[in-house]
Amino acid sequence: MKKRLIAISALCLALAPAAIAQAEKMTEAKTYLPGDIVWKDGPAALPPGSKRAILEGDPGKEGFYTVRMMYPDGLHKIAPHTHPQAEHLTVISGTFNVGMGEKFDQSGGQAMPAGSYFCMPAGMKHFAWTTGETVIQLSGIGPQNIVYLDPADDPRNAKQKAP
């Protein structure tokens, strides 16, 4: 476990120069007060009712991005998946739960209350869930994507099958 933590920490530090380079491209300061944040329906890859606010960059393109995700009250499961890029997550409000591995198992997860921070390297198999309204902030180097281990778990596939 200690080796894994060291490896993850090293990766997070390795990505810092890319984030700094992106920040140097900024031409003006940006401030987002809570009432200024524009929430839109979340991407189809996430549970129904999810909302997303893009704060910086474009998560669908190359380059640094920061987004906030809001999960509504109730149990919301995000099945085992990976990301092609490293991801950095801060819990803004509520509790975000994450577990590692190929099978969804809430007993093996870690509850992260507001104020928690988590980063993981590209390709790490994990799953997540919320039980009440939860807001997280994700930052990374795009393009951002989520790849479900079992395509049947991907909400995008369910929407394609709907009449």
Task: Describe each PLM feature range.
Residues 1-9:
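Bacterial N-terminal signal peptides that target proteins for export
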Residues 8-16:
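Bacterial N-terminal signal peptides
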Residues 22-65, 151-163:
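A short, N-terminal "cap"/entry segment at the start of jelly-roll beta-barrel domains
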Residues 28-30, 107, 127-163:
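Double-stranded beta-helix
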Residues 58-60, 102-123:
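Short acidic-glycine-tyrosine-enriched beta hairpin
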Residues 62-83, 111-112, 121-122:
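Conserved short histidine dyad/triad with adjacent acidic residue
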Residues 72-75, 82-103:
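Glycine- and acidic-residue-biased ligand/ion/polar-headgroup-sensing regions
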Residues 78-80, 98-99, 120, 125-131:
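Short beta-strand His + acidic residue motifs that chelate non-heme Fe in jelly-roll/DSBH
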